[in-house]
A protein has these predicted regions:
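A compositional/biophysical signature of low hydrophobicity enriched in polar/charged and small residues
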Residues: 1-162
Length: 162
């Protein structure tokens, strides 16, 4: 069952989603509560497993990995029993940012960041396609990644207008 949040918890989570480095005093001011109350709330959200960590977003371009791709991976039927082992194996490759375990035609969606198309090709052919348990791959290059950090969409907002 999903945790129930009051308006203050929602506001805290929304602010931290936008800026996880926000000092407690600034967070408290942003949500309109006392700093001591804010700290207690954040610690309670951590203890409940709602806040699982604070992460740094790194510019892939700045570390010479500007090209991202999403690679759909389908495993052969004879390795399905080892499907979780494949996920753990994939995530260990230095090019891999995320591994998504899927329902549907493909078993995984692997998000990679590489220097260029040569490195992408080599990764797919030398690591994924060369694995006897991998039946198929399909690679899509990411042109742009947009992210909406609203955790609790306004139910009265209706569909977006373009």
């Amino acid at each position: 069952m999903a945790a129930q949040f009051d308006a203050v918890d929602r506001a805290i989570l929304a602010e931290l989603a936008r800026n996880a480095r926000l000092p407690n005093n600034a967070l408290a001011a942003a949500v309109g509560i006392a700093p001591s109350t804010c700290l207690t709330r954040v610690r309670a959200l951590q203890a409940a497993g709602v806040i699982t960590g604070f992460r740094t977003e790194v510019s892939m371009r700045a570390i010479d990995r500007p090209l991202q791709a999403m690679i759909s991976v389908g495993l052969s039927a004879d390795v399905r029993a080892d499907i979780r082992d494949y996920a753990r194996r994939f995530i260990r490759y230095p090019q891999v940012l995320d591994v998504y375990y899927l329902a549907g035609r493909d078993d995984f969606l692997v998000n990679v960041a590489v220097r260029d198309t040569d490195e992408l090709r080599d990764f797919v052919t030398d690591y994924l396609s060369a694995d006897p348990g991998v039946a198929r791959t399909e690679t899509s290059i990411v042109f742009e990644h947009l992210r909406d950090l609203r955790l609790f969409p306004d139910p009265d907002a209706g569909p977006p207008v373009f």
